[in-house]
Amino acid sequence: MSLGKRFLRQPAVQRLLGRLAAAYLRLVRRTNRFVIQAGNAPPGKADAWLDAHTPLIAGMWHGQHIMMPLMRRPHDRVATIISRNVDGNINTIALEHLGTRVIRASGARGRSRATDMRAKGGAEGLRAMLRALKDGESVAFSADVPKVSRRCDAGILTLARLSGRPIVPAAVVTSRHLRFKSWDRACLGLPFGRGAIVLGDPIYVPRDSAGEAFETLRRFVETEMNRVHARAYALVGRADRAALYREAAPAAVAAPVGDAA
């Protein structure tokens, strides 16, 4: 193990980095002029729209996950799922300082990540998110297939199908930002600019949805997430450049496995 990795494994270092990350995101939120659009709600009615659809399942593209905490209102109860690794430890500390509850779960091994919610954090993670939604807590997480940018994973639809709660495509962007050269073209907002939080119309997944009907819904969610992100960037006067790097979509995924609740 390298010296750098050993350094990052120190609990004190992880706590410091997590707190610094939280402080930075607060700075971004406070120094950008944000506009909020929620579904078909008229201007100034986003709060009422959110209250009417809570608890909900907020889905973002992976490159936007850094900005996710900026969506949360002070009184919102929100949970997210984070892997059990060093990066996850730092992210957990940051998110908890920003008022988001974190579900820690291990990733799946030896099964198709494109077809099973368990790949987002194991059956334990799926059950934990179902419990959160049942208790009135919204959940938010990246919805794309790991390592395949902007390809909607079947998992978010599985969660919606089992819980009966709506998927809400979401995007948080700023006019000034850093774009990383990672597989997901992750984006980190910078202070002192314009910001946009855009939430799409709620999408419900019928309990009996399967096969081609399920796949049609999956593609619709993917399309809506792209539309919401494009709209958010348009509001801040920028192009959604990460869309240019979208990898070719693989063959259509199969319907998810049976209930895991």
Where are these regions (language model features)?
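A cross-family acyltransferase "interaction/gating" segment
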Residues: 149-211
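Catalytic-site beta-strand/loop segments enriched in glycine and acidic/polar residues
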Residues: 122-163
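Short, flexible loop segments at the rims of nucleotide/cofactor-binding pockets, characterized by
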Residues: 32-35, 57, 115-121, 146
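Membrane-anchoring hydrophobic helices of lipid-metabolizing enzymes
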Residues: 1-72, 76, 99-100, 223, ...
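C-terminal functional extensions of proteins
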Residues: 202, 209-233, 237
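Catalytic core of membrane glycerolipid acyltransferases/transacylases, capturing the structured
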Residues: 55-115
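Extended, non-globular alpha-helical segments
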Residues: 104-133
